[in-house]
Curated annotation (Swiss-Prot):
Organism: Aeropyrum pernix (strain ATCC 700893 / DSM 11879 / JCM 9820 / NBRC 100138 / K1)
Pfam family, one: EF1_GNE
Superkingdom to which the source organism belongs: Archaea
Lineage start: Archaea, Thermoproteota, Thermoprotei, Desulfurococcales, Desulfurococcaceae
SUPFAM superfamilies named in the record: eEF-1beta-like (SSF54984)
HAMAP family per record: EF1_beta
Keyword line: Elongation factor, Protein biosynthesis
GO terms, molecular function: translation elongation factor activity
Protein name: Elongation factor 1-beta
Family under the similarity heading: Belongs to the EF-1-beta/EF-1-delta family.
Protein backbone atom coordinates (compact mmCIF):
# COMPACT_ATOMS: atom_id res chain seq x y z
CA UNK A 1 0.00 0.00 0.00
CA UNK A 2 1.38 3.39 -0.98
CA UNK A 3 1.98 6.04 1.67
CA UNK A 4 1.97 9.82 1.42
CA UNK A 5 3.86 12.45 3.40
CA UNK A 6 1.61 15.28 4.53
CA UNK A 7 3.27 18.54 5.58
CA UNK A 8 1.05 20.35 8.07
CA UNK A 9 1.39 23.58 9.98
CA UNK A 10 -0.24 23.42 13.41
CA UNK A 11 -1.10 26.72 15.08
CA UNK A 12 -1.29 26.61 18.89
CA UNK A 13 -4.17 28.39 20.59
CA UNK A 14 -1.85 30.32 22.93
CA UNK A 15 1.67 31.77 22.84
CA UNK A 16 2.48 29.96 26.10
CA UNK A 17 2.15 26.50 24.50
CA UNK A 18 5.55 24.94 23.90
CA UNK A 19 5.78 23.48 20.35
CA UNK A 20 7.78 20.47 21.58
CA UNK A 21 5.13 19.67 24.18
CA UNK A 22 2.42 20.05 21.55
CA UNK A 23 4.34 17.72 19.19
CA UNK A 24 4.56 15.05 21.91
CA UNK A 25 0.84 15.41 22.63
CA UNK A 26 0.07 15.00 18.91
CA UNK A 27 2.30 11.92 18.59
CA UNK A 28 0.57 10.26 21.53
CA UNK A 29 -2.91 10.92 20.10
CA UNK A 30 -2.38 9.81 16.49
CA UNK A 31 -3.95 6.42 15.76
CA UNK A 32 -2.16 3.58 14.00
CA UNK A 33 -1.61 4.26 10.33
CA UNK A 34 -0.24 7.75 11.04
CA UNK A 35 3.38 8.47 11.88
CA UNK A 36 5.20 11.75 12.55
CA UNK A 37 8.36 11.63 10.41
CA UNK A 38 9.73 15.11 11.16
CA UNK A 39 8.91 18.17 13.21
CA UNK A 40 10.04 21.77 13.39
CA UNK A 41 9.00 25.24 14.48
CA UNK A 42 8.14 28.31 12.44
CA UNK A 43 7.95 31.77 14.05
CA UNK A 44 4.64 33.50 13.28
CA UNK A 45 4.39 36.78 15.25
CA UNK A 46 4.66 38.20 18.75
CA UNK A 47 6.37 35.08 20.10
CA UNK A 48 3.84 32.67 18.60
CA UNK A 49 5.41 29.65 16.92
CA UNK A 50 3.65 27.23 14.59
CA UNK A 51 4.56 23.58 14.68
CA UNK A 52 5.43 22.05 11.29
CA UNK A 53 5.00 18.31 11.01
CA UNK A 54 5.55 15.74 8.30
CA UNK A 55 3.03 12.97 8.85
CA UNK A 56 3.03 9.69 6.93
CA UNK A 57 -0.35 8.14 6.19
CA UNK A 58 -1.90 5.66 3.78
CA UNK A 59 -2.53 7.09 0.34
CA UNK A 60 -5.96 5.51 0.03
CA UNK A 61 -7.36 7.01 3.25
CA UNK A 62 -10.97 7.94 2.58
CA UNK A 63 -11.37 11.71 2.50
CA UNK A 64 -7.67 12.35 1.86
CA UNK A 65 -6.15 14.59 4.53
CA UNK A 66 -9.51 15.50 6.10
CA UNK A 67 -9.22 12.80 8.77
CA UNK A 68 -5.74 13.82 9.94
CA UNK A 69 -6.78 17.49 9.93
CA UNK A 70 -9.75 16.72 12.19
CA UNK A 71 -7.63 14.52 14.46
CA UNK A 72 -5.14 17.35 14.93
CA UNK A 73 -7.81 20.03 15.45
CA UNK A 74 -9.36 17.97 18.26
CA UNK A 75 -6.12 17.86 20.27
CA UNK A 76 -5.94 20.19 23.25
CA UNK A 77 -3.84 23.28 22.49
CA UNK A 78 -4.41 23.23 18.71
CA UNK A 79 -6.24 26.19 17.22
CA UNK A 80 -5.84 25.62 13.48
CA UNK A 81 -4.26 23.14 11.07
CA UNK A 82 -3.07 24.00 7.57
CA UNK A 83 -2.01 21.35 5.04
CA UNK A 84 0.91 22.75 3.05
CA UNK A 85 1.88 19.81 0.87
CA UNK A 86 1.07 16.18 0.12
CA UNK A 87 3.50 13.96 -1.75
CA UNK A 88 3.79 10.27 -2.43
CA UNK A 89 6.53 8.44 -0.57
CA UNK A 90 8.75 5.93 -2.33
Amino acid sequence: MARVAVVVKVYPDDVSIDPKTLAERIKSKLPSGYEVLAEGEEPIAFGLKALKLVIAMNEDTEGGTEEVEQLLKNIEGVQEVEVENVSRMQ
